[in-house]
């Protein structure tokens, strides 16, 4: 269903889904080919990003998500691996409709979801509640990592990691990046607020 909904979203910052269907009992997606790399690759190459470049990439990500949220589609698995940077350096979000709701039971599988767990919103962890605000939380964690060079919560154990997201506030980016603009710090704090209602309602609101 999400894949079909994603196919109807026309936005330059979303990888286009051209067709969905079933063949020999298997579901398939026909998607746009993007020539480029994912954000994780760039993070590994650069270590950290300037505030200007971070805000550009985050802004393009939010623009893509705004179209999705208006169409009633929530991504549920925003992380650097799912943010593609095309050969012009622009964002294209991938894996709409491929992301599955994660339950606490699957989170306990050692190591499997460590990459995803670092970006999961508290309500996703506690209630399997997929919301536009959950996407924004993940975007905020990603921005935090781009500026600081690491995510705010770390652990080798995914269960410990998700416990931190549920029970601890995300530290201000100012604790990791001394002298950072107060407006940028406030913006990230808004995106990563622990309570759903304390975040912007959706990506369109976050952009205003």
Regions from the language model: what does each represent?
Residues 62-73:
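Protein kinase catalytic-loop region centered on the HRD/HxD motif
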Residues 57-58:
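Activation segment signature within eukaryotic-like protein kinase domains
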Residues 106-118, 125:
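Activation loop
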Residues 1-8:
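AlphaC helix of the eukaryotic protein kinase fold
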Residues 24-38, 42:
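Conserved short submotifs of the Hanks-type protein kinase catalytic core
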Residues 20:
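Activation-segment/catalytic-loop signature of the eukaryotic protein kinase fold
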Residues 118-208:
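C-terminal lobe helix-coil module of Hanks-type protein kinase domains
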């Amino acid at each position: 269903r999400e894949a079909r909904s994603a196919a109807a979203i026309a936005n330059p910052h979303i990888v286009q889904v051209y067709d969905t269907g079933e063949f020999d009992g298997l579901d398939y997606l026909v998607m746009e080919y993007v020539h480029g790399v994912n954000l994780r690759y760039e993070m590994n190459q650069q270590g950290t990003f300037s505030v200007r470049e971070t805000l550009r990439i985050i802004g393009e990500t939010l623009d893509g998500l705004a179209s999705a949220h208006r169409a009633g589609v929530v991504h549920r698995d925003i992380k650097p691996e799912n943010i593609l940077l095309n050969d012009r350096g622009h964002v294209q979000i991938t894996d709409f409709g491929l992301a599955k709701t994660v339950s606490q039971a699957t989170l306990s599988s050692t190591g499997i979801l460590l990459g995803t767990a670092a970006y999961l919103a508290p309500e996703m962890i506690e209630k399997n509640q997929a919301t536009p605000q959950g996407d924004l939380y993940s975007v905020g964690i990603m921005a935090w990592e781009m500026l600081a060079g690491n995510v705010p919560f770390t652990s080798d154990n995914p269960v410990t990691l998700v416990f931190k997201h549920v029970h601890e506030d995300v530290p201000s980016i100012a604790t990791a990046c001394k002298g950072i603009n107060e407006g940028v710090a406030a913006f990230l704090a808004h995106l990563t607020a622990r309570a759903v209602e304390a975040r912007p309602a959706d990506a369109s609101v976050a952009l205003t």
